[in-house]
């Protein structure tokens, strides 16, 4: 058992018989009163996301997560297919459980698969990925390099704010934790 104050983004815990993953967590201290933990949590069986508030002293059951190296192969309907790099077994993970992470997946990408009791519950991505710009507006004459930027749609459908000099077909390094542009590849 651990206290909710010790929970961090990405941790998996059990509460009321449900496997839950912390997507986002904030410590909230109202003007008067005790600190509260505001969290966005995902039910790993249904894929639903709920915003909840808990007291820091509440205890939850931490779940042991097995991690295995894998490779993303392809999309099949509403699931992504991965291959375990040691056993060569293939696993499917529903896009609902992947959430926004599906926008960073490119074929043959190496990832970490997370398992609880033999069931796949999620994917850990590398901190950065290389994606190709599928569509963006052409550079506007007179725009400066350090200007406000413009939206660019990547090959996976992810929309990223990029500098004005970026054009269609450019390969970019994208941060997977916040979806921001880092540099050209």
From Swiss-Prot:
Mention any one GO cellular component term assigned to this protein in its UniProt record. cytoplasm
- Keyword Cytoplasm on this protein? yes
Name where it's found: Cytoplasm
Top-level taxon in the UniProt lineage: Bacteria
Q: Which GO terms describe its biological process?
A: peptide biosynthetic process
What is the similarity comment for this entry? Answer: Belongs to the elongation factor P family.
* Organism of provenance: Limosilactobacillus reuteri (strain DSM 20016)
Q: Kindly list the organism's lineage.
A: Bacteria, Bacillati, Bacillota, Bacilli, Lactobacillales
Q: Which PROSITE patterns match?
A: EFP (PS01275)
Q: What does this protein do?
A: Involved in peptide bond synthesis. Stimulates efficient translation and peptide-bond synthesis on native or reconstituted 70S ribosomes in vitro. Probably functions indirectly by altering the affinity of the ribosome for aminoacyl-tRNA, thus increasing their reactivity as acceptors for peptidyl transferase.
Q: Which GO terms describe its molecular function?
A: translation elongation factor activity
Name of the protein in question: Elongation factor P
| UniProt keyword list | Cytoplasm, Elongation factor, Protein biosynthesis
Q: In which pathway does it act?
A: Protein biosynthesis; polypeptide chain elongation
Where is this protein chiefly located?
Answer: cytoplasm
Q: Which residues cross the membrane?
A: none
């Amino acid at each position: 058992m651990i206290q909710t104050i010790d929970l961090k983004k990405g941790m998996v815990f059990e509460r009321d018989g449900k496997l839950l993953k912390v997507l986002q967590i904030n410590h909230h201290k109202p003007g008067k009163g005790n600190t509260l933990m505001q969290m966005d949590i995902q039910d790993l069986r249904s894929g639903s996301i709920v915003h909840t508030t808990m007291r820091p002293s509440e205890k939850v059951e931490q779940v042991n997560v097995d991690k295995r190296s894998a490779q993303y192969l392809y999309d099949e309907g509403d699931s992504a297919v991965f291959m375990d790099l040691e056993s060569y077994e293939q696993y499917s993970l529903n896009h609902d459980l992947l959430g926004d992470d599906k926008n960073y997946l490119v074929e043959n990408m190496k990832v970490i698969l997370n398992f609880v009791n033999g069931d796949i519950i999620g994917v850990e991505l590398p901190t950065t990925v290389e994606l190709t710009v599928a569509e963006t507006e052409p550079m506007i004459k007179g725009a400066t390099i350090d200007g406000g930027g413009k939206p660019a749609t990547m090959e996976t459908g992810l929309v990223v704010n990029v500098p004005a000099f970026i054009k269609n077909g450019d390969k970019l390094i994208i941060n997977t934790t916040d979806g921001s542009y880092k540099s050209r590849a």
